[in-house]
UniProtKB/Swiss-Prot annotation:
Record family assignment: In the N-terminal section; belongs to the major facilitator superfamily.
Induction: Expressed in exponential phase, peaks about 18 hours. The most highly expressed gene in this operon. Protein is associated with magnetosomes at mid-development then decreases (at protein level). Third gene in the 4 gene mamXY operon.
Name recorded for this polypeptide: Magnetosome protein MamZ
Free-text function comment from the UniProt entry: Required for correct biomineralization of the magnetosome; probably converts and then transports some form of iron. It is partially functionally redundant with MamH. May function with MamX, MamY amd Mms6 in biomineralization. Despite its strong similarity to MsrQ (AC V6EX82) this protein does not genetically interact with bona fide MsrP (AC V6F0A4), which is encoded elsewhere in the genome.
GO molecular function, one term: oxidoreductase activity, acting on diphenols and related substances as donors
GO annotations of cellular component type: magnetosome membrane; plasma membrane
Chain's gene name: mamZ
Cell compartment(s), UniProt: Magnetosome membrane
Organism lineage string: Bacteria, Pseudomonadati, Pseudomonadota, Alphaproteobacteria, Rhodospirillales
Subunit structure: Probably interacts with FtsZ-like and MamY proteins.
Region entry Ferric reductase-like domain, required for correct magnetite crystal formation, spans: 444-645
Length: 648
């Protein structure tokens, strides 16, 4: 299918040497990165205004609905863009870049249609708007990721910080400064329509420019065979280098920076616009100006960080930049009025920290990655950043609606502090770089503590907010309504159930056998959040009143589906230890734990029936469960799923 838009300037199979990489190609790359990030930024920045004015989403649901749309877009994008990253090692980066622009064109065209449906029928256009956001996110992210990989192909260790810094500079310029200028049109008649037309025009121009002007550098790799599966190689590289483990942990929070700020700062401005006496279009434009200041800080800081990482440890650079951004987020969360121009100060701190972390991650990943799997390595970094975006946007949406518009920023700050502590732990244990950027120690670091801390984050966030709001002193969850706590815990229980269910297929497809040692931990965290979900319903919502609970179950019978799933989950949790496996016997234990398939199906149905009609997230989760259950059924029937799903 990709043959139809083979670049006219040369076939990927022949390749181009870095010395032959013309200056005009650099200009094209920088321009394409700018417009690719602009498409992503415009789609996020305009979203809160569209949901409020066009689709008529109620104020009390705005945070959750905005977050749900972003989460759905990120989940689909993770799968698609990750696959494109693997594929690019074999067919070249340029064809994938052209494909990304075409996907963005399709999304932009649908956005104009969803706008008309929204104007005519209100929330009825949301389904199409979900699809629009998915396509725009997949297209824009594909373009940006593959351009970064292409620069990695042509750069060397000596010039990589400079070239990657230039690329990040242009990406931030398009995603913040240029976006902020264009978003000012939202306050004028017809401005929203013009803003929505721009991604369509950009996509068409970007596709044509890619075909006409870009050429591949790296030689295409042969399809993997046997033990050479690229995902297995990616895993081996990451697990053998503590710097990459830190980099991927930092990517979990760093990629979400611009999305979190663009989305929730805009929502914050819109939510208080009536109180300060300004229109909502003005509030959207004001938010864009502040995000533009953030971008200005990033642009100004990139040369400084580029010089720093050329001369100092990248581990120190990641720790310093994360801590700076963390302080900025927490400071931002202390402001009561987003129209106070002093909020620019914490935004500048976040921008400076984001610049250092993002540039360091790009340079470090390309430096350490073997050339044959560079696309897969960059895609793996995107995958981790996408998962972080899903978790942070999902939690941020809940916190925005239930606890107030500043809560998502506190969330980001505390998470970045956690990774900063991990960087400090590495340095304290002698795991650092020499002056020429080689590891001083070959000591390997176990991932279990990092996986545990990441899985515990949703609970830590909830407890931390409860302490801040005085739960333990006054016996209530502060400002947090019980419904928020209940849904929050239930969503995370289901998230970890799906992750646990997916680990065996991923292990079988990629051959990464070491994933098995994390499956039990993930499954127990699913049970942990399920227990908290049930306890919140029984105690916080109904105060152990059995009569009221029975009446509620009669009105909402889908609760029985969740209860049945929880009862099935209990024996699985209590038989997960090695001693219980030996006591029961391996075959009987496997038969018992097949109940996880039924549990996931029950929870998916429970989630769909419990959600409101504006929420598309349950259907994405249910689709994931269907795919995973199909995989197990097909394997049970003797089908060769591995051959069908392996890249190559």
């Amino acid at each position: 299918m990709l043959e139809a838009w083979m670049p006219k300037s040369g076939k990927p199979s022949t390749g181009t040497t870095p010395a032959d990489f013309a200056p005009t190609q650099w200009n094209i790359i920088y321009l394409l990165m700018t417009v690719g990030s602009l498409v992503a930024a415009l789609s996020i920045s305009i979203q809160p205004l569209l949901l409020d004015k066009i689709f008529g989403i109620a104020f009390e649901k705005e945070g959750a609905v905005n977050a749900d749309i972003q989460v759905v877009a990120e989940i689909v994008s993770i799968v698609c863009v990750g696959w494109f990253g693997l594929l690019s090692d074999r067919i070249g980066r340029v064809r994938i870049i052209a494909t990304g622009f075409l996907i963005a064109v399709a999304g932009a065209a649908m956005s104009l249609l969803s706008l008309q449906i929204g104007l005519a029928f209100g929330a009825a256009g949301l389904v199409l708007f979900y699809l629009t956001r998915v396509l725009l996110t997949v297209g824009a992210d594909t373009v940006q990721l593959q351009l970064s990989t292409l620069v990695g192909d042509v750069s060397s260790r000596a010039n990589r910080p400079r070239l990657m810094g230039n690329l990040v500079f242009m990406m931030v310029f398009g995603g913040t400064m240029l976006s902020a200028i264009i978003m000012q049109m939202a306050d004028y008649k017809g401005g929203v329509f013009i803003i929505m037309c721009l991604p369509l025009l950009i996509g068409i121009a970007g596709f044509q420019m890619t075909r006409e002007s870009l050429r591949d550098v790296a030689q295409p790799q042969q399809a993997p065979t046997g033990d050479e599966h690229p995902l297995r190689q990616v895993w081996s590289v990451i697990t053998s280098d503590p710097r990459l483990q830190l980099a991927f942990a930092a990517a979990f929070y760093t990629r979400a920076d611009v999305i979190i700020l663009s989305l929730f700062f805009s929502l914050w401005c819109i939510s208080v616009s009536d109180l300060v006496g300004v229109t909502r279009t003005y509030a959207t434009a004001h938010a864009a100006v502040m995000i533009g200041l953030l971008g200005l800080a990033v642009l100004a800081a990139i040369p400084l960080w580029r010089s720093f990482i050329e001369r100092h440890s990248r581990i120190s650079a990641i720790g310093a930049s994360l801590s700076l951004a963390a302080v900025g987020y927490i400071w931002l969360g202390m402001f009561a009025n987003p129209f106070n121009w002093l909020v620019a100060l914490p935004l500048l701190m976040v921008g400076i920290g984001h610049a250092g972390c993002f540039v360091t991650l790009q340079v470090l990943t390309v430096d350490v990655s073997p050339k044959p799997i560079l696309g897969a390595m960059v895609g793996a970094g995107y995958l981790v950043g996408g998962l972080g975006t899903v978790m942070l946007v999902q939690s941020g949406g809940y916190y925005f609606d239930a606890l107030g518009p500043r809560a998502p920023f506190i969330l980001m700050g505390t998470g970045k502090m956690l990774v900063t502590l991990y960087a400090a732990w590495l340095l304290a244990n002698g795991i650092d770089e020499t002056c020429d950027h080689h590891l001083k120690s070959t000591r390997k670091v176990d991932w279990k503590p990092l996986v545990f801390l990441t899985a515990a984050l949703p609970f830590v966030w909830l407890i931390g907010r409860s302490v801040i709001e005085g739960y333990f002193s006054n016996g209530s969850l502060g400002e947090a309504p019980v419904g928020f706590v209940n849904r929050y815990l239930g969503d995370w229980a289901f998230t970890f159930l799906i992750i646990s269910l997916s680990m065996r297929p991923v292990q079988e497809i990629t051959g990464i056998k070491s994933l098995a040692k994390y499956r039990r931990m993930i499954g127990l965290f699913a049970f942990f959040y399920a227990v908290l979900h049930v306890l919140a319903y029984v105690t916080l919502e109904w105060a152990l009143n059995l009569g009221d609970m029975a009446s509620d179950i009669y009105k909402r019978p889908f609760i029985l589906l969740g209860l049945a799933a929880f009862l099935l989950l209990i024996p699985l949790a209590f038989t997960s230890t090695n001693s219980q496996i030996k006591k029961i016997g391996g075959k009987r234990w496997k038969r018992l734990h097949r109940a996880t398939y039924v549990i996931n199906a029950l929870v998916a149905l429970h989630f769909i029936l419990a959600a409101n009609h504006e929420n598309g997230e349950p259907y994405v989760y249910a689709a994931a469960v269907i795919v995973l259950l199909w995989y197990r059924f097909y394997q049970w029937r003797g089908g060769n799923v591995l051959r069908a799903l392996r890249i190559g």
